[in-house]
Structure formats: structure tokens, C-alpha cells
Curated annotation (Swiss-Prot):
Endpoints of the signal sequence: 1-30
Glycosylation positions in this chain: 60
Residues that coordinate or bind Zn(2+): 85, 123, 217, 252
Protein name, entry field: Purple acid phosphatase 8
Source organism: Arabidopsis thaliana
């Protein structure tokens, strides 16, 4: 029986988070909200990453969820990460929108997936009621759900920084077409972005963790449909490079992908295959940087210990597609 192990850490995390929010409110300096994620007794952590998924089980979402449950059990995962676009096509309209149950609670039902889910917002989520996804009511409906715009998960040997990337993208403001975006809490935009970039930079500088992982919905580097996000290349990437981030994990492109930068030690991982994928939609890329690309559904796992970080990509049938690992001394390996 692992029910106590599943439930108690979630309650502990929420309690610590509430305390952090209270303390932050008394502090005049801006600071990203923080969660504390307890590691395993040996200090290691294991988690799954999935993105671009919320389609009421269609486009193989249920099949991917099934395999996530199996792999999650095998790895005894501690938590999960969603890279955004949690609910298609236009987010949710309220905390009581049936999409939440139909696309999340009733899909990811495996015992191994009853762990904290750390979520970021994607552009499709911004087309709905953003405050609904951020509402604590969702945590009352399903205690796994954790979603803020930007925040940090502290897990001793690894710090994970979640960044709200949608407001960086110019075309959502300049050329929204028929889409209506919920920009409440984001405007004035320049002030929001400047504050966010400062907060992320400060949080990264203050991190004492062995590993630093940044999660955002949008790509920084990708050979997929959307390609590179120029705004993030110009504004966010220099901060990540200056602070020696190990991984940048994103969704947005509906594929699985690993790009190894030749300009820095950052590894760019795309996990956007949670449901609908874009078969054959891939652009040319420098073969020295492209480690792996898969134009189908799937997800990835991450394992961290004091000395090692391991990433594995799986397809919708649970087959291993790509493995990569690194040691903190800079030794890399495609397994």
C-alpha cells in the first residue's frame, strides 16, 4: 500500500506553500512562490513530464496516460510536470468546467500518477479563464493540481523553475486573429515581463541546488512546427546561460525532442506529445545539436541524484525512444 506516501507529501507541500505565500506577502521584495518537494531517502528524485494533452482522452491522450501510469509505477515517481496547453482548445471557463474532470482527473487515474502535478500555462490556456486554472478550487476538486504563473520547486539536489512564457510572445498581442486571450494580471505587459525576468534571474542566482531545471510552455530551440521562440531567445535564454541551467523543458511543439546547444551546457527538451501530434512536421536542424526528434505522441522521465541526471523519452506505447544522461563533471552520454 502506498496511499499514505501518495497523499501525505501533497498535504505537506500545500501547507509549506501556504506558509511561503504568507511570508512573501510580508516581504517588500518580489520573490517567486516556492514549493518544497521532499526527495527520496537517498536524495534522488524521479518524475514524468507531459505536455499539450487536455483533449478529453482523444488523440491517444488516454493511451499516453496508460503508459505514463505503467512507467510511473516502474520508476516509483515522486511527481509529474505538465509543460502547458493543459486544456484544448480554449482553456477552461471556470473551476467547475467539465474539462477539468474529463481531461485530467478521469484520464490520469493510475495509482502511480496520484502524486503532485506541477503545471504551467500554455497559449491555449490563456484563451480561456486563466484565473480558473490558478484557482485553489481546482486543488479542492483534485489535490494533485498545482498551477501558478511562475514559481519554484525546491527539492534539495534540484531546483525547478517554472516560467510563464505566453506573455513573451508578441504575436498573441499584435496578431491574435480570432482568439481572445485573458491578459488579466499580465498588463501592463512590459512591467510584468521585466519583473518576471528579474525574479527568475534572482531565483537562479540564489539557488544552491546541484541541478537547475527550467520549465516553460514555449520552445526556445526547436525543429518542430513552431520553431524557435525569438522573444525567449533574446530575453530568457541569456539569463539561463548566465546561471548555468542544466535543462530547459518545454511543450508547444507537439513532438518529443532533444537539442544539445553548442553554445552552452543547456539541453533543450521538448515534451509536447501528450495527445495530438504533428506527423512529419519537422524542419532542418544542425545535426551537431539535434540528438533526437520524434513526431508522435509520448512523454519523458527525469531522474536526478547527487551525481547524475538521466532523461528518457517514451512513445505512446511505452517504448523507449531515446536516453540521455550527464554527470555533474560534464560527461554526457546518449545511451
Amino acid at each position: 500500500m502506498d496511499s499514505l506516501r501518495d497523499v501525505k507529501p501533497i498535504k505537506l507541500i500545500f501547507s509549506i506553500f501556504c506558509l511561503v505565500i504568507i511570508l512573501s506577502a510580508c516581504n517588500s521584495t518580489a520573490e517567486l512562490p516556492r514549493f518544497v518537494q521532499p526527495p527520496e531517502p537517498d536524495g534522488s528524485l524521479s518524475f514524468l513530464v507531459v505536455g499539450d494533452w487536455g483533449r478529453r482522452g482523444s488523440y491517444n491522450q488516454s493511451q499516453v496516460a496508460l503508459q505514463m501510469g505503467k512507467i510511473g509505477k516502474d520508476l516509483n515517481i515522486d511527481f509529474l510536470i505538465s509543460t502547458g496547453d493543459n486544456f484544448y482548445d480554449d482553456g477552461i471557463i471556470s473551476p467547475y468546467d467539465s474539462q477539468f474532470q474529463d481531461s485530467f482527473t478521469n484520464i490520469y487515474t493510475a495509482t502511480s500518477l496520484q502524486k503532485p502535478w506541477y503545471n504551467v500555462l500554455g497559449n491555449h490556456d490563456y484563451r480561456g479563464n486563466v484565473y480558473a486554472q490558478l484557482s485553489p478550487i481546482l486543488r479542492d476538486l483534485d489535490c494533485r493540481w498545482i498551477c501558478l504563473r511562475s514559481y519554484v520547486v525546491n527539492a534539495e539536489i534540484v531546483d525547478i523553475f517554472f516560467v510563464d512564457t505566453t506573455p513573451f510572445v508578441d504575436r498573441y498581442f499584435d496578431e491574435p486573429k480570432d482568439h481572445v486571450y485573458d491578459w488579466r494580471g499580465v498588463l501592463p505587459r512590459n512591467k510584468y515581463l521585466n519583473s518576471l525576468l528579474t525574479d527568475v534571474d534572482v531565483a537562479l542566482q540564489e539557488s544552491m541546488a546541484k541541478w537547475k531545471i527550467v520549465v516553460g510552455h514555449h520552445t526556445i530551440k526547436s525543429a518542430g512546427h513552431h520553431g524557435n521562440t525569438i522573444e525567449l531567445e533574446k530575453q530568457l535564454l541569456p539569463i539561463l546561460e548566465a546561471n548555468e541551467v542544466d535543462l530547459y523543458i518545454n511543450g508547444h511543439d507537439h513532438c518529443l525532442e532533444h537539442i544539445s546547444s553548442i553554445n552552452s551546457g543547456i539541453q533543450f527538451m521538448t515534451s509536447g506529445g501528450g495527445s495530438k501530434a504533428w506527423k512529419g512536421d519537422v524542419n532542418d536542424w544542425n545535426p551537431q545539436e539535434m540528438r533526437f526528434y520524434y513526431d508522435g505522441q509520448g512523454f519523458m522521465s527525469v531522474y536526478t541524484s547527487e551525481a547524475e541526471l538521466r532523461v528518457v523519452f517514451y512513445d505512446g506505447l511505452g517504448h523507449v525512444l531515446h536516453r540521455w544522461s550527464t554527470l555533474k563533471n560534464g560527461v554526457y552520454s546518449d545511451i
